[in-house]
Amino acid sequence: MAKTQKELDFLRDLYIGADWTRRFTDLIDKHFDLSESENVLYINAGTGEHAFALRERLDEKVGIFATCEDDDILHIARDKAAAMRSDVDFSMIRFEDEAFDSVIVDASFTPPSRYEELVEEAVRVATTGANIGVLSVTSGSFGEIFSLLWEVLFNEELGEHGHAAEEMITELPTLTMIKDTARRVGLENVQTYVANEVFEYDDGAAFVSSPLVADFLLPVWLVTLDEEDQQRVTDKLSQLIDSEDGNLSFRFSVKATLLTGEKG
């Protein structure tokens, strides 16, 4: 049975931050300069782990504001802030134009179709010359999964005989595409940084039952199928992984990507 949004937000706090988000935020820590910032906005901050880490690292005079994706995530983030006595300001408000000299956007868990919308929002709230960093997944990710999903969908005569898997592949933007998007909405001096992150599971069952895959990735990829067909595909995918990899672990890779630029 599909989980409620509140249940998903709880799982996201427990598992996704460590298993997924940290692999992306490492790019911010390595390549995004916040040393001269006076105020920072973190868009899609999740339950706040990286925002708290930035608070510890930056001068106490730097104001850190963070927006959350929904009310339940906001509640978790605020509870954490209270427990840690952190002054990171979590909210879901719409900030004024040109209010921040640094903006971070975590689009790593956002549908690719919303990428431009999030970059536009970052540009709107940034002052002229502000540094903007956007985290996302780019083309070449999940290839090991998509090829197996295509085979399962084709064999089971689902998803228009594998067409759904082909759409999963083509939906992910290339580096050129996200650079073009950034320049189109007003960023200059655009650069990208990519880390090839590998996720490993003992076998097919461990893969399809992991919270990242079972509760977040597969439901999005198989959204066009009814619940019964989704379960059938999941079971067949697990079996196919084991038949192909034998006693070896199953791995898939993700192109964790940071795009940086300055508002012109």
State where each predicted segment sits.
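Conserved SAM-binding loop and adjacent beta-strand
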Residues: 11-29
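Class I SAM-dependent methyltransferase SAM/SAH-binding core
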Residues: 39-95, 117
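Short glycine-dipeptide loop
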Residues: 60, 126-132
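A short acidic, Gly/Pro-enriched loop at the edge of an enzyme's catalytic core
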Residues: 93-103
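A short SAM/SAH-binding and catalytic strip from SAM-dependent methyltransferases
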Residues: 101-116, 136-138
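Conserved catalytic/acceptor-binding region of the Class I
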Residues: 116, 131-202
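Core SAM-dependent methyltransferase catalytic element
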Residues: 186, 208-214, 254-264
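C-terminal helical/coil "lid" or tail adjacent to the Rossmann-like core of SAM-dependent
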Residues: 191-246
